[in-house]
Amino acid sequence: MFYNLKRKFEKNLNKHKIRKEVVDDAGTIETDFWKQHSIGCLSKSSPVEAEIYRKFGDDSTKNYPTSIKANPYIGPELGVSDIRVGEEGAADFHTEKGIIVGNIRMGFGHYRISMAIASAAHALGYEPYWMDLNSYGQTTCTKVIGAQNDLYSMGSRLSQKSRLFNRLVWEPMNYEGFRKLTYNAADQKNAELMAPVYANIPKDIPVVATHVWPAQAALHAGMKYVVNAIPDNWQMALHLAEGSIHTVQTHYAYQGYRILNGMQGNDVLNPMPEDALFYTGHYVDHELVSNIETDCAARKQRKEEGKPMR
């Protein structure tokens, strides 16, 4: 449950700073946890980054204005405000009670988890700010995410039509391709392109990201307190964001991510630091669980009386 995350997060809030990165001439990020990545694995991401700059542009020197607007859809119920990047307006962040919910709106699962985080944060007295990195059309960040989303959607649709494509391409990519540290190495480097959207956001406000890209981008931008809420129980290096607190929903996921299971073939890797990974339970909306005992008792009574369960 999110409430476990709150206790863990508050306990570790002051001690979890971004670990200092030492960047060598090849552009390799080298910290204790990341030394298990090979130099070639990390440096190979540079040509990919150059290609993205060529295709989508480089806005690393842009100073996008940031504003806060009321969310007309979930704002009234969950107290959510939108962070708008590239729009002029008031940006009065609540630095004591504010918490950013970072997402990319890629798939309903990530969106649902974002709503659960915002719901629980609101119930606990925090002020959730909704930061959708896929909604800032003028930025390199959104252009990159949008292109990836289009590509993934095309592959997903094709996998439903072609059994051969699904067997030879789609399933291997999702089960093993995204699992590899080499994939994560390039992804972490590319996330630097997304960092400018955080430029004018106070760095002390916690970020809870429901996809790894908002977490990685936040870290590159210098956000000090980043929680990476991993959605998948199947352990994949895709979901790693070094410097963040990683959270998982099941014991199975905890074991797999702790030992980086299968992320470099059959190699036995150094484990994730104990203070970088926490089992929190499922990410569930406050509204769904706050009355769960009474609701379940009512269902049992209806069953005993031969009435409909719902």
Please give the residue ranges for each predicted region.
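Structural motif
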Residues: 98, 205-206, 245
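Conserved N-terminal ligand/cofactor-binding loop architecture of enzyme catalytic domains
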Residues: 2-77, 115-196
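Active-site proximal beta-strand in glycosyltransferases
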Residues: 206-209, 215-233
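A short, charged/proline- and glycine-enriched loop
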Residues: 89-99, 222-223, 305-310
